[in-house]
Curated annotation (Swiss-Prot):
Binding annotation for ATP: S15, I16, G17, K18, G19, L20, D72
Ranges where the record places region Amidoligase domain: 1-266
Cited Gene3D superfamilies: 3.40.50.880, P-loop containing nucleotide triphosphate hydrolases
Catalysed reactions listed for this entry: UTP + L-glutamine + ATP + H2O = CTP + L-glutamate + ADP + phosphate + 2 H(+); L-glutamine + H2O = L-glutamate + NH4(+); UTP + NH4(+) + ATP = CTP + ADP + phosphate + 2 H(+)
Any matching Pfam family: GATase
Binding annotation for UTP: S14, K187, T188, K189, P190, T191, Q192, K223
Keywords linked to the UniProt accession: ATP-binding, Glutamine amidotransferase, Ligase, Magnesium, Metal-binding, Nucleotide-binding, Pyrimidine biosynthesis
More details: CTPSs have evolved a hybrid strategy for distinguishing between UTP and CTP. The overlapping regions of the product feedback inhibitory and substrate sites recognize a common feature in both compounds, the triphosphate moiety. To differentiate isosteric substrate and product pyrimidine rings, an additional pocket far from the expected kinase/ligase catalytic site, specifically recognizes the cytosine and ribose portions of the product inhibitor.
Underlying gene: pyrG
Residues where Mg(2+) binds: D72, E140
Protein name: CTP synthase
PANTHER family linked: CTP SYNTHASE (PTHR11550), CTP SYNTHASE-RELATED (PTHR11550:SF0)
Length: 534
């Protein structure tokens, strides 16, 4: 089958839900037996989000091949069976970088390099390259229609219909139909203006996905269809759902996937959405009550920084048929106020990854609290490193143990800079990134969770466990249960005489899905649930 292209744009406001809409559509089309791939086009000039502040950009999602990408790729992977790559996310910065490199090589034979055709051709080339081998390529354009940064991307996708043929390209526009409380009615004017702006660029949307608080009445759909030049049945209501994993079911009920296959002339079987219905049923009606998990971090004022983490914990709840209630605790608050009372009543404690010294002592106090009070604990990346520091200080009595990331001259650098990172001065794209294999210790918490001895997980770090302290820590009871054998790197640590205490250097949250929860999150939530019963 010749690849079909679906371009997802957004209007009126940012954060309107394009990513979830694209991911949900991917889930619906995959349920129809189609091979789906996703791609996100970001208009900012940064080469990638790897060096951007979590407070500005939210989470950085890492792919198997080591790309630091937009958090929407996390949605795409969670909702489908896809394993995305560096090709699945590109930015204005990457496009211009590539075009300038070609110009310096002489690829343009002395021609004047312009936005049209050179920049737009580069954008189209990257879209086509990513789409190879798929039936459907869903491409989300970041930003909002009308943003000056988005114009080259919109021009490129406008050209796509002429390049590939009308029956092979579909434009889906996500827009807002606000409810005005004082007037007690929904207003279509923002949608009309958004579509008008899109049409001025030369793009006529085929489907409108209308985000609204209330169901759109038939007469309002007819009005939108008339003024926006789309079929009435192509005006799709997208109301706020009880849970984001209910969105595919809601959009299917509205007929979104039916409209897509009809307009793209695709023969596809009816979707089997039973697995999604089961997920939603477990979320809405859990059989084993609720567990309370505290996330102790430094970016808690912007929970988007921990997007995949929060979702993976929810997946652990799905696997254990229980509801997971998350509370976010700023580790600096622990430093300022002490830990007394801040973690009362929690059933599990998780310390996530992060960068910089701020808040680290608060994390160490939270880890000590979990260790000494036998509360299930999960440390990820920096969380694992601080767990080792806490153990060295309070069990091995190395009072000055720390990470050389935060104190270069510390006497006992339990965590130190990786050998291959020494001499690296550039920040962007230079960490240990992507998937690496790991061998597990038989009988460990990790091995029991995975059910195998050999695993592969995604990394994003520069610092690691210092092997000079292996013997000391092991002789004092710490288990090194996961090793990257090629580099002899410690990837997982555990405390065996504890209900469940695991720290891992990698980011397991990036591989968890609602239909296939990650083994470590499944085991962590199971331990928290058992902690309640105990």
């Amino acid at each position: 089958m010749k690849t079909k292209f679906i371009f997802v744009t957004g209007g009126v406001v940012s954060s309107i839900g394009k990513g979830l809409a694209a991911a949900s559509l991917g889930a619906l089309l995959e349920a129809r037996g189609l091979r789906v791939t996703h791609q996100k086009l970001d208009p900012y000039i940064n080469v990638d989000p790897g060096t951007m502040s979590p407070f500005q950009h939210g989470e950085v999602f890492v792919t198997d091949d080591g790309a630091e990408t937009d958090l929407d790729l996390g949605h795409y992977e969670r909702y489908t069976s896809a394993r995305l790559s560096k090709k699945s996310n590109f930015t204005t910065g990457q496009v211009y970088f590539s075009v300038i490199e070609k110009e310096r090589r002489g690829d343009y034979l002395g021609g004047t390099v312009q936005v049209i055709p050179h920049i737009t051709d580069e954008i189209k080339s990257k879209i086509l390259d990513n789409a190879k081998g798929s039936d459907i390529a869903i491409i989300e354009i970041g930003g909002t229609v009308g943003d000056i940064e988005s114009l080259p991307f919109l021009e490129a996708i406008r050209q796509f219909k002429a390049d590939r043929g009308a029956g092979n390209v579909l434009y889906l526009h996500v827009t807002l139909v606000p409810f005005i409380k004082t007037a007690d009615e929904l207003k279509t004017k923002p949608t009309q203006h958004s579509v008008k702006e899109l049409r001025e660029i030369g793009i006529q949307p085929d489907i409108l996905l209308c985000r609204c608080e209330q169901d759109l009445p038939r007469e309002m759909k007819a009005k939108i269809a008339l003024f926006c030049n789309v079929e009435e049945k192509a005006v799709i209501t997208s109301m706020d759902a009880e849970h984001i994993y209910a969105v595919p079911l809601a959009l299917h009920k509205e007929g979104l996937d039916e409209q897509v296959v009809e307009k793209l002339n695709i023969w596809a079987k009816a979707p089997d959405l039973t697995p999604w219905q089961q997920v939603v049923d477990k979320l809405m009606h859990p059989g084993h009550g609720k567990v309370r998990i505290a996330i102790v971090g430094k970016y808690v004022n912007l929970t988007e920084s921990y997007k995949s983490l929060a979702e993976a914990l929810t997946h652990g709840g799905i696997a254990n048929d229980c509801r997971v209630h998350l509370s976010y605790l700023d580790s600096e608050k622990i430093e300022q106020e002490g830990i007394d009372g801040l973690l009362d009543g929690v059933d599990g404690i998780l310390v996530p990854g992060g960068f910089g010294e701020r808040g680290t002592e608060g994390k160490i106090k939270a880890i000590e609290y979990a260790r000494t009070r036998k509360i299930p604990f999960f440390g990820i990346c920096l969380g694992m490193q601080m767990a080792v520091v806490e153990y060295a200080r309070n069990v091995c009595h190395l009072d000055d143990a720390f990470s050389s990331e935060f104190k270069q001259d510390c006497a006992n650098p339990i965590i130190h800079l990786m050998e291959e990172q020494k001499g690296v001065s550039r920040k962007g794209g230079t960490m240990r990134l992507g998937a690496y294999p790991c061998t597990l210790a038989k009988g460990s918490f990790a091995q029991k969770a995975y059910g195998t001895l050999d695993i592969s997980e995604r990394h994003r770090h520069r610092y690691e466990f210092n092997n000079d302290y292996r013997d000391l820590l092991v002789s004092n009871g710490l288990i090194l249960s996961g090793i990257y054998k090629e580099g002899d790197l410690v990837e997982i640590v555990e405390i065996p005489d504890h209900p469940w205490f695991v720290g891992c250097q990698f980011h397991p949250e990036f591989k968890s899905k609602p239909l296939n929860p990650h083994p470590l999150f499944r085991a962590f939530i199971a331990a928290a649930l058992h902690n309640i019963k105990a």
